[in-house]
């Protein structure tokens, strides 16, 4: 299941709750074409990687999180372990998204 996070406090709580698990964060917007294109694939990865926490953040609804995480374009994927960012990339690249997850779990 992909969790939607709407503010910075919830985002930080999710990172803390995940502990040592990998957290994959999708920063997107409803008006972003590439974001819409990759969203079903992002959701499908939940089934493939059961021990990974998946979070989606709408940058328009959660501007505080986008600013805190220094998101400049959409979609941006950030990867966290133990509350710290370990990887990041921008763009709707399905192969890169899956390969990055595989390399970090």
Curated annotation (Swiss-Prot):
Q: Where in the cell is it found?
A: Nucleus; Cytoplasm; Secreted
Residue stretches making up the Thioredoxin domain:
2-105
Description of post-translational modifications? May be nitrosylated on several cysteine residues, depending on the oxidation state. Nitrosylated Cys-73 may serve as donor for nitrosylation of target proteins.
Q: What is its main location?
A: nucleus
Q: Which residues carry this modification: S-nitrosocysteine?
A: 69, 73
Q: Write down the position(s) of the site called Deprotonates C-terminal active site Cys.
A: 26
Is Transport included in the keywords of this UniProt record?
yes
Which Gene3D superfamilies does this chain map to?
Glutaredoxin
From the record, give the transmembrane residue ranges. Answer: none
Q: Which GO terms describe its cellular component?
A: cytoplasm; extracellular region; nucleus
| Keywords (A to Z) from UniProt | Activator, Cytoplasm, Disulfide bond, Electron transport, Nucleus, Redox-active center, S-nitrosylation, Secreted, Transcription, Transcription regulation, Transport
- Give the family per the record: Belongs to the thioredoxin family.
Q: Which PANTHER family match?
A: THIOREDOXIN-LIKE PROTEIN 1
Q: What is this protein called?
A: Thioredoxin
Q: Identify the species of origin.
A: Gallus gallus (Chicken)
Q: Which gene encodes it?
A: TXN
């Amino acid at each position: 299941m992909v969790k939607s996070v709407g503010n910075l406090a919830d985002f930080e709580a999710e990172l803390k709750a995940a502990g040592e698990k990998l957290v994959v964060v999708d920063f997107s917007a409803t008006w972003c074409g590439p974001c819409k294109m990759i969203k079903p694939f992002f959701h499908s990865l939940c089934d493939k990687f059961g021990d990974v926490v998946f979070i989606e953040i709408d940058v328009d609804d959660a501007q505080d999180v986008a600013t805190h995480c220094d998101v400049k374009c959409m979609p941006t994927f950030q990867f966290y372990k133990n509350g710290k960012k370990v990887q990041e990339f921008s763009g709707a690249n399905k192969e890169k998204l899956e390969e990055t997850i595989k390399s970090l779990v």
